[in-house]
């Protein structure tokens, strides 16, 4: 069988929940797939997705402060607020939600997954950066990417259309492709992720753009 990563399991759960909980909010971390932003089922059910800081405690607090229905972290930490749960990291509830998803649909999960647009996502990469330098390095990269957006610089034939700076910098393009650079919270490195719904080559081009920005150690 094929491996399904946690961010896409979260999206399947969110889509299913949105049918009975319209106008809900969902919190996801900045490493998660960009499919949440443009998902037709979530949009049709007037649901909002907020990208937030990576980390168990950050997602938990944001779910509480936003009164979100649920929060999904790519690492697999899932949180469900009332009336589904009590807002803490809940593996049993997560399994229940997957079972409910399957119970409401006669298809196999592989067939349900095939409804999602195909994306090409890099593994989470961790270029070395000293602990006492990594946050300043990221701050500088945020400024550089903000300038690139402001100046409408073309990257692989597209401009950056959106920037999220709640946790490093996540920048997106019109075609739904995006890249992320943030400081690791628990080791001397940066965190780099790229994703494209267009092609594997596009994903690689965004990584090459990031690689050129990174300072040489």
Give residue spans per PLM region.
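Short Gly/Thr/Asp-enriched flexible loops that form oxyanion-binding sites at enzyme active sites
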Residues: 1-11, 37-39
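A conserved helix-loop-strand patch within extracytoplasmic ligand-binding domains
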Residues: 12-20
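Phosphate-binding and adjacent anionic-ligand microenvironments
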Residues: 20-193, 199-217
């Amino acid at each position: 069988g094929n491996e399904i990563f946690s961010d896409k399991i979260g999206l399947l759960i969110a889509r299913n929940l949105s049918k009975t909980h319209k106008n809900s909010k969902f919190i996801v971390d900045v490493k998660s797939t960009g499919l949440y932003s443009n998902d037709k089922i979530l949009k049709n059910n007037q649901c909002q997705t907020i990208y937030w800081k990576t980390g168990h405690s950050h997602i938990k607090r944001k779910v509480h402060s936003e009164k979100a229905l649920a929060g999904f972290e790519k690492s697999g930490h899932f949180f469900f607020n009332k009336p589904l749960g009590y807002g803490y990291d809940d593996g049993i509830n997560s399994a229940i939600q997957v079972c409910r998803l399957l119970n409401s649909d006669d298809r196999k999960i592989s067939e349900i997954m095939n409804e999602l647009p195909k994306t090409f996502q890099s593994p989470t990469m961790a270029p070395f950066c000293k602990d006492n330098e990594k946050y300043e390095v990221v701050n500088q990269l945020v400024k550089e990417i903000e300038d690139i957006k402001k100046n409408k610089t073309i990257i692989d034939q597209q401009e950056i259309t959106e920037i999220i700076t709640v946790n490093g910098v996540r920048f997106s393009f019109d075609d739904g492709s995006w890249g992320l650079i943030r400081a690791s919270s628990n080791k001397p490195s940066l965190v780099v992720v790229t994703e494209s719904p267009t092609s594997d080559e596009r994903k690689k081009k965004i990584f090459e753009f990031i690689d050129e920005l990174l300072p040489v150690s």
